Amino acid sequence: MSQKGKSAMVVGNGGVGSAIAASLAAAGIARLALFDVNEESSRKLGARLQEHYPNLQLEYASNDPTGFDLLVNATPMGMKEGDPMPVDLDKVSSQTFVGDVVLKSELTAFLQACQAKGCTIQVGVDMLFEQIPVYLEYFNLPTTTAQRLRELADIRC
């Protein structure tokens, strides 16, 4: 999915959520909603992003996913069975692209519910597959591609 000119919501603005938000801003996202249970984290992240991307439209303090092209769960919600959903699923459009950073299970309850609504989804382990080649290159180790890692992976949910 090309992010240029699109809208996105990132739920969870810690380290992973901050990196995702910065990547989205760098990719040309037009509108970005930041939500964290600690609103100060969202506002500090927004201030840092605004310094580098002054035309980025930012929103805070709501985890209402209505009207976003992209929705990312960057919280630990979904690591344990019975965790609450990060957003109200009734408000997620079937046209929304939904990603989750949780690695513990390939298809979290959140992703399963969004997929059942017709959303295109991206599992958390895909994030890891994209990071591994960069780590290997950084440490001057023999590298591979994210696609090759996907081919070799034996993921059990």
At which residue positions do the language-model features occur?
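Hydrophobic Val/Ile/Leu positions in short beta-strands of Rossmann-like dinucleotide-binding domains
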Residues: V10-V11, L34, D100
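NAD(P)-binding Rossmann-fold cofactor-contacting core
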Residues: I29-H52
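Short, conserved loop/helix-junction motifs that constitute active-site signature segments
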Residues: Q3-K4, V87-T96
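Glycine-rich adenosine-cofactor-binding loop
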Residues: G5-A25
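Short glycine-/small-residue-rich Rossmann-like dinucleotide-binding loops
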Residues: T75-G78, V102-L103
